[in-house]
Amino acid sequence: MTILYRARRGWAALTLAWLAITSPVFAVANETDEPAALLSAFFGLDNALPFMANVLCLGASGLDGMPVVLSHTIDPETLEAEDFEVVTQSGAKQTPHCVTMRPAQDPGELRTVLLIGEFGNADDDPPAFVRIAGDLMSDGSRSKRINFRGSDVAVTPLDKGPSLVLAERIAVSNLAAETRGTLCPQGVQEVVRVTWAGGVRRPNREEAGDAERMLYRVTVERADGSTQEIAPAALADLDDGDNNHLLCLDTAAVAVSVDFPAGYLVDPNGDLNPDTHIMVGAGLN
């Protein structure tokens, strides 16, 4: 469960950070034809949640952790554990013990949900896919409200590292309201939020920093159609324990894709990230 990643001394604290309407309107697409979808389900910890996890989710100690990322920001008032169904390799169906959106609770980030429960064992009956079984609604912040019921996605196995699953441009003018973490410096011309399948840190358990900034490669497209690969001028939205980074760009050229090389960031299970690539969206939540 990569969202729970922390430095060794603060690991349990970050774990705890993860625990903490109207009649449904069914739709399959929003106003720009973006489908409602589960983007990822990441089997991050197998029977490994610490005892302190019981503080915000009684009975969580020793259970599994699985962050899932959705295509749109959701209405937290419609979020219930019964909305999710985890199906194991053998076909067994499991409902989470509890769910939480912590710590990815900034505006625009409300699309990552941590599932806590018993979802099978990595060695003999691992989780195979996650399905939305209830009426989990988007918040309608940038499109009409849609229902995720029926969406499903294959589970990334326990021994695989986290990948980028979403990238979107966000308005520089809204930057201060978009994050509780560190901010981009003054004067940036474009900001891209990237979302990982779960929280990531350096192999030494420290927060990502300038070295990781230089590893991010953003392809931008100029007005004449030419493209260039650049590194962000700064890396922001750090020190808040979630699975999002802000890439602060000092160019007005439009960001079209983001790459990050394999082997530099890890999840709580110690699995290194693979080489990962994601196209940049227009900021639709």
Segments from the language model and where they lie:
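Non-catalytic beta-sheet/beta-sandwich ligand-binding modules that flank or precede catalytic cores
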Residues: F26-N285
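Bacterial N-terminal signal peptides
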Residues: A12-S23
